[in-house]
Amino acid sequence: MSNAIPFIKRLILFLLPLTIILLYTEVQLRKMPNSYSKKKLNLEKQIGNAEVLVLGSSQALHGIDPTYFSLKGINAANISQSLYYDKEILKREIDKAKNLKYLIITVSYFTYFYEIHNSLESWRDLYYQKFWKLIPNAETTIWDAKNYSYIALYTPLKTAKYATSNFNVDLAPTLKTNGYIPLINKKSIKFISDQEGKKRVSLHNSIIKIENFKHTIAYLNEIIEIAKTKNIKVVIVTPPVYKTYYENCNEKLLTANDHLTQSISNYDNIKYFNYLKDKRFDKNDFYDNDHLNLQGAKKFSSIINTEILK
């Protein structure tokens, strides 16, 4: 036993610096701002005065800038955000939304058949859990290190990259306080083509699962019911995409989406605005095949203000 004591001491001396480095790294990663943590903070600060709340995925995140609303608005959409998290964010904030008049729910090509947990981006569930403090949409295994470690969540490779900047990193540097993130790289227009549009639609087709439908509709109905109890007007909006995207979509699915949303809007005085193929938008308004650029977002937000928030 006496021979083991020096070994244990050496082991402790070896592990102690490593443990300190790991703990320091975990703390720094936790403090590092990203779109989830920043949106949560901004929404908490502004929801009490907000008159318009926007929910949805990246087409809303990059396509709707509340700056151009005549009412005080905030955009709570995020990349690949599903109706489940739209619902959970609304539930979390609704009692503080004392002045909310309009709830804008954006619905895209894949929305009714999409859940994060059984998609290519299932890792995002843990971001909502870690940074929004929301219950994830699917049970996670206790053996998954991402449940406990920010190093595992961000991946060791990215963590090493952030460490070279001493974790002085903002992962959402262009996110405005109203929740909007502009897309301004003019060179991206070269990716707007029929070929790239097909690739994008193919990706979205791969995340469409019929079995998700019964769940997503239930989430949408719950969102509507929550808004009704607070006398908030619900508006469902389909954002515009460029023709290289919608011409490659499954036309039957587009029609089914439209009919379904129309039928929902017939109840409880819910309004539906379908801008998917709106001819007021041309190639110069788009960042890529299915996202508006800065100019397009200004145009779309102004249209929403004129045609919806009146």
What spans do the regions from the language model cover?
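Active-site segments of SGNH/GDSL-like serine hydrolases
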Residues: 224-249
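Hydrophobic membrane-insertion alpha-helices, especially the h-region
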Residues: 6-28
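A short, Lys/Arg-enriched amphipathic alpha-helix followed by its capping loop at the start of a domain
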Residues: 47, 64-73, 226, 230-232
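Membrane-embedded segments
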Residues: 59-148
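Structural motif
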Residues: 51-53, 102
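Alpha-helical transmembrane signal-anchor/signal-peptide segments
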Residues: 29-49
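Long, positively charged, glycine-interspersed low-complexity recognition regions
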Residues: 2-4, 250-310
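Secreted/periplasmic serine-hydrolase-like ester/acetyl group-modifying domain
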Residues: 116, 120-230
